[in-house]
Regions:
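Start-of-helix register in tetratricopeptide repeats
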Residues: 8, 42, 59, 76, ...
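Alpha-helical segment of the N-proximal tetratricopeptide repeat
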Residues: 5-36
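Terminal, low-structured helical/coil segments at or just beyond the last alpha-helical repeat
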Residues: 1-7, 95-127
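Canonical tetratricopeptide repeat
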Residues: 46, 80, 114-118
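Structural marker of alpha-solenoid helical repeat scaffolds
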Residues: 36, 70, 103-107
C-alpha cells in the first residue's frame, strides 16, 4: 500500500541528500515533492538544480522555467538557471539572468555575486 507522504518530510529528506551530494536520492524525493506541491517554486528550483548536477540539462531547464513561471523574481532560480546556461555554453542567456539579478539586488546579493563569479570563471577558461 502507498502511505501518505508528508511533503515537508520529503523536502527535508531531499535537502539532506543534497548536502551529502546524493543527487539520485534527492531527485526521487524532489520528484515526489513537486507532485505533491506543484506550485512551490523553490521545490522546482531544487529539482532542477539536482537534475543539473546529474547533467540532465534539458529536464533541468524545463524545471527552472516552471520555477520562474511561478515566481519570476526567484533569485535562487535565476542564479542556478544562469549557471545552467554557462554549463551549456550559452553565456548570453547567463548574462540576461545576471542583469535580472542586478535589477532585483541593486546593492548586491549572494545570488548575483555567485552567478557573476561563475560567468567570470567560465570566461577566463575560454581565454
Amino acid at each position: 500500500y502507498d502511505k501518505k507522504v508528508d511533503p515537508t518530510e520529503l523536502y527535508e529528506k531531499a535537502t539532506s541528500h543534497l548536502k551529502n551530494e546524493e543527487y539520485r536520492k534527492a531527485l526521487r524525493a524532489l520528484g515526489k515533492y513537486t507532485k505533491s506541491k506543484p506550485k512551490d517554486a523553490d521545490g522546482w528550483t531544487l529539482y532542477a538544480f539536482t537534475q543539473r548536477k546529474l547533467k540532465n540539462y534539458k529536464k533541468a531547464e524545463v524545471n527552472y522555467e516552471k520555477a520562474l513561471e511561478l515566481d519570476p523574481e526567484n533569485k535562487i532560480a535565476l542564479e542556478y538557471q544562469g549557471e545552467l546556461f554557462v554549463e551549456t555554453e550559452r553565456l548570453g542567456l547567463a548574462q540576461v539572468n545576471l542583469n535580472k539579478l542586478k535589477e532585483l539586488c541593486p546593492t548586491s546579493c549572494d545570488e548575483l555575486e555567485q552567478l557573476r563569479k561563475y560567468i567570470n570563471q567560465e570566461a577566463e577558461k575560454s581565454l
